[in-house]
Regions:
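N-terminal and secondary-structure boundary signal
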Residues: 1-222
Length: 222
């Protein structure tokens, strides 16, 4: 459970030292969130949803055996629905019968104001557990559009948006931008970032676009 993990890694001491108010999203008080999902029509969400001025998603980039990737969107979509209701892990109420649909339906209702995806210690292989850690010192993706941020993260793992069903659905829903050519990228060049990640992950530098930026469906300009 969350508090056990916090104690095991020493975060409870940090909270005490910094005088931070910790909220465990697995418990109430709740507000009911209506969802456009094939199985789960609504879910309780901690009242912090209506009290927070800004919602920040901070997580590490991982491959995931069902969700394809874990980045800023899945971090909130699967982290906020309470385990008290959906189970430990959250497989009691039908979420995993349509996982991508659940993630997209949650993110149509919960805005992420700032997405921070650390690639400093990423994971490839069989996530969410037993994967292979990848060290990319100082490599981080930050932005105010969670779809754009996760699109870049997906590219590091070798996926275009449609390979991550919930990401492509959210793009089509107008929640954010998934066309790399329309994303305002700052910092290092996207191809350089992909080379850094792939070299550390696989021992060989691989660039998804191979000279020219592919469009959202993988077609390169002539």
């Amino acid at each position: 459970k969350t508090l056990d993990v916090m104690k095991n890694v020493g975060y409870d001491k940090v909270l005490e030292e910094e005088n931070v108010n910790f909220v465990d999203m697995n418990y109430g008080p709740y507000t009911e969130l209506v969802l456009n999902h094939s199985i789960i029509k609504s879910t309780p969400i901690n009242n912090i949803l209506n009290e927070a001025d800004v919602i920040i998603s901070f997580t590490q980039l991982k491959m995931h055996e069902e969700a394809t990737i874990t980045a800023s969107i899945k971090n909130i979509a699967m982290g906020w629905p309470p385990a008290e209701i959906h189970g430990y892990p959250k497989k009691k109420t039908g979420i995993h019968e349509d996982l991508h649909g659940f993630i997209s339906s949650i993110m149509n209702q919960i805005p992420i104001d700032l997405s921070i995806v650390s690639c400093d210690k990423a994971m490839i292989g069989t996530g969410p557990t037993d994967g292979i850690p990848v060290d990319n010192d100082g490599l981080i993706i930050v932005g105010t559009d969670p779809v754009a941020v996760d699109t870049v993260g997906a590219r590091f793992l070798g996926f275009l948006p449609q390979a991550v069903a919930y990401l492509y659905k959210l793009y089509n829903d107008g929640i954010g931008e998934a066309k790399i050519e329309n994303i305002d990228l700052k910092g290092i060049d996207i191809s350089k970032a992909e080379k850094i990640f792939s070299k550390n992950a696989y021992g060989k530098a691989v660039v998804l676009d191979n000279k020219n930026i592919k469009d959202i469906h993988g077609t390169q300009p002539k």
